[in-house]
Amino acid sequence: MPEPEGCRMSTFKIEKTGFLDRLFPERHWDELIGEKYKEVLQKISETTQLKDEVAGYIKNNRIRLGFHKQYKSGGGWTLLRNITLSPGDNPLSPYVLSLIVHETFHLKQTLWMRLSMQGELRAWQYQKYTYPEIARTKGNDIGSNGEAYAGTKEFWDELSKLSPDSRDDLEQAQGLMRKVSPGYRSGCLPLFPPGKEFVYFWRQREYAKAFGVLWKLITCK
């Protein structure tokens, strides 16, 4: 039985609102402000490398932090160049601090690089490389017992050895990321930035795959 016209309009409005919230979560997020925001930057600033590369970048570029429901991830970057975190998470925990480090690394990339496995692998590798500085027990690796992503250290170690410039390695990285975080949508991303992947398949006359790069990026869930 068809829905009344009013119901269809109501559903459309809900879907439109949901779509806009995914694009611009700042519309309805719980922003981290005041002393809590300063505490996060101070915590990240306790090491020289992260003070300059992350905390300084966040401060200088006026990057905002806010809590918003995530979809199969712990955090994310926004089109307005801000960072979202999962509601209820402690922003001062090593886990969340490492997410902020990860997403800040993304914000330094071009938009198209962020939308690729190449950009994703580089961010994961940076997250692993810098984690010991913010670990619960300083010096511990990410994924080790008692730390963020406990029990997944072997997968992080494998990810750290992969080349972001190798197509084979990027395909391997997709599987490893899902082992670290089941449900993670690494398979939605093209291996290289969308434009580069489109040209790659086009030149091989694999036209369906060329257009599929863009279609998958838009529709993948």
Locations of regions flagged by a protein language model:
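Long, well-structured alpha-helical subdomains associated
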Residues: I134-K221
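Active-site recognition of the HExxH zinc-binding catalytic motif
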Residues: S98-L111
